[in-house]
Amino acid sequence: VGLYSNYLMLSNKLLLIEQIIFSSLVASIGNVIARDSPEKRLQIFQAMQSASFIFCGIITAGFGLLANDVITVWLGKEYTFSMLTVIAVTVNTYFSCALQPLWIYRDATGLYMKTKYMMLAGSIVNIVLSVILGRFMGIAGIIFASAIARLSTYFWYEPKLLFHEYFNSRTTGYYISILKNIGLLACVIAVLSYVFSGWVVTDWMTLILKVVVTAAVCSSIFVLAYCRTEGFQVIMNKVRQICGHTGR
């Protein structure tokens, strides 16, 4: 548990960037839900989702590629997890990132009142799977159980409810977009893992250099992949607002 808390802290710090940006949109989304047509609501949601895909690519790839290096330099190699466990934490990090727009809409629409029993079901599934997978896979199994519980319950139920009640649309395109993002992300992590396989991090200087290179490469790939989407414009507008407030 102590080892996992270190990885969880790293994951949460990375996710905080996206959470700050998206949480500031809750009031605006409430106005969209109250005033605009289902088509406009869907358009705004898709813009937020494509923005989250950029964050997902950078945050999740960065975590998967660098988590063990950070822990090694920070605490020592004896405090690192196996690659299987890092993958499990990375999967959970991805879903926490990719589901941000859905959670924002859930809060803005009050949809959580209709999903509370599904959330309870997810918790029960998580507990059962944690016991089963934990016996066979250790800490990795317990962490994977959380991801499986999400996938088997509210991951499919909440979008179905949101799209049906507020967008008058099917969820097919939503799931396809997530699969495409996962595919691109998996390719990026696999290729960079191979490219960086000979890069041994031994101190803070080599770690910082690897972080900078990883961030630059991942940012370039995912910005290029989504730069034509409305979500990219959402990010740029928020960056301009932050820079504008800072400059005053």
Describe these PLM feature segments:
Residues 1-12, 78-84:
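Interfacial/gating helices of multi-pass transporter permease domains
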Residues 113, 120-155, 159, 169-172, ...:
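Membrane-interface helix-loop junctions in multi-pass transport and translocation proteins
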Residues 8, 44, 49-64, 140-165:
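Short alpha-helical transmembrane segments in multi-pass integral membrane proteins
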Residues 58-77, 132, 136, 194-199:
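Short membrane-interface helical motifs at transmembrane helix boundaries
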Residues 7, 11-49, 103-108:
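Helix-loop junctions and terminal segments of transmembrane helices
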Residues 90-122, 136:
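Membrane-interface junctions at transmembrane-helix termini in multi-pass inner-membrane proteins
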Residues 63-94, 167:
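Interfacial segments at transmembrane-helix termini and the short loops linking adjacent helices
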Residues 166-170, 193-248:
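Membrane-proximal transmembrane or re-entrant/amphipathic helices at the cytosolic face
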